């Protein structure tokens, strides 16, 4: 079907969007925070439809609808949901529909991006999610843990003496820690220790899962990283990995063009 497709990935922290052409190439793209002003789409070509992954709830859904209505009120919209099988990926969840739409679209995007390879997909957002995807497209299961920022924020909120450290502050603290080899990898004050400890928890989860998966499958597994906190977590990883930051939008493009 001709015409560009509007793709929207509404996560808990921000909303990413793109226009994809018939070749599934992104014509233009962007992102905005939930609290930010709405983006200006007035100069965009009219899409043939919108494909939406929304894990951020009803308020985000209403905002997305209002944004689309302001530019193309009659635009058809498809709210993507996980299903048993789609675009070459088979859903291994006990109840396939309960898998998050972002994880489902990301699996589809990853399978297309790395055909014929076993994959462990690690996405770093509000939550850190892991998906095990076999080369034949079978999603065999996953893990969900608090994201790096959520870990640090939870410690600050639920302890009497630990500070609340933001990602920006933690990144600066880790830069300082890395510059002082005499103290790495251990910190000598609380903010540095909290930042590094939560980062190492993320890296340890990923590396343990990757090694366990290679052992279970008795085959090489490509570790694919995505998400806003990936830049920081990469610095703590000691295993081979590949970055791909548009897995969900890529998966949405595939879903749209299969419709």
From Swiss-Prot:
Domain of life assignment: Bacteria
Recorded GO MF terms: ATP binding; pantothenate kinase activity
InterPro entries: ATPase_NBD (IPR043129), Type_III_PanK (IPR004619)
GO cellular component entries: cytoplasm
Cofactor annotation remark: A monovalent cation. Ammonium or potassium.
Keyword annotations: ATP-binding, Coenzyme A biosynthesis, Cytoplasm, Kinase, Nucleotide-binding, Potassium, Transferase
Pfam families cross-referenced by the UniProt entry: Pan_kinase (PF03309)
Record bears the keyword Membrane: no
Chain residues that bind ATP: 9-16, 126
Subcellular location: Cytoplasm
Reaction(s) catalysed (UniProt annotation): (R)-pantothenate + ATP = (R)-4'-phosphopantothenate + ADP + H(+)
Active site positions, chain numbering: 102
Disulfide bond annotation, renumbered to this chain: none
Binding residue positions for substrate: 93, 100-103, 190
Self-association and partners: Homodimer.
Function: Catalyzes the phosphorylation of pantothenate (Pan), the first step in CoA biosynthesis.
Name of the protein this chain belongs to: Type III pantothenate kinase
UniProt organism field: Burkholderia thailandensis (strain ATCC 700388 / DSM 13276 / CCUG 48851 / CIP 106301 / E264)
Gene: coaX
């Amino acid at each position: 079907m001709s015409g560009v497709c509007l793709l929207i990935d509404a996560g808990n922290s921000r909303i990413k969007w793109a226009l994809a052409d018939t070749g599934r190439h992104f014509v233009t793209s962007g992102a905005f925070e939930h609290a930010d002003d709405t983006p200006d789409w007035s100069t965009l070509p009219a899409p043939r439809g919108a494909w939406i992954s929304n894990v951020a709830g009803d308020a985000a859904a209403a905002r997305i609808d209002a944004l689309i209505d302001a530019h193309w009120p009659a635009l058809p919209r498809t709210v993507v949901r996980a299903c048993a099988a789609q675009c070459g990926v088979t859903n291994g969840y006990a109840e396939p529909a309960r898998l998050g739409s972002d994880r489902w679209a990301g699996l589809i995007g990853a399978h297309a991006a790395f055909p014929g390879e076993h994959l462990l997909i690690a996405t770093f957002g509000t939550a850190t999610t892991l998906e095990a995807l076999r080369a034949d497209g079978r999603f065999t299961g996953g893990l969900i843990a608090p994201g790096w920022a959520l870990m640090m924020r939870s410690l600050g909120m639920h302890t009497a003496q630990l500070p609340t450290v933001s990602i920006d502050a933690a990144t600066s603290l880790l830069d300082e820690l890395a510059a002082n080899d005499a103290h790495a990898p251990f910190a000598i004050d609380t903010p540095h220790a909290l930042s590094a400890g939560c980062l190492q928890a993320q890296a340890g989860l990923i590396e343990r899962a990757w090694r366990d998966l290679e052992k279970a499958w008795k085959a090489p597994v490509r570790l694919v990283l995505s998400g806003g906190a990936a830049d920081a977590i990469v610095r703590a990883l000691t295993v081979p990995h590949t970055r791909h930051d548009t897995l969900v939008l890529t998966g949405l493009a595939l879903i749209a063009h299969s419709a």
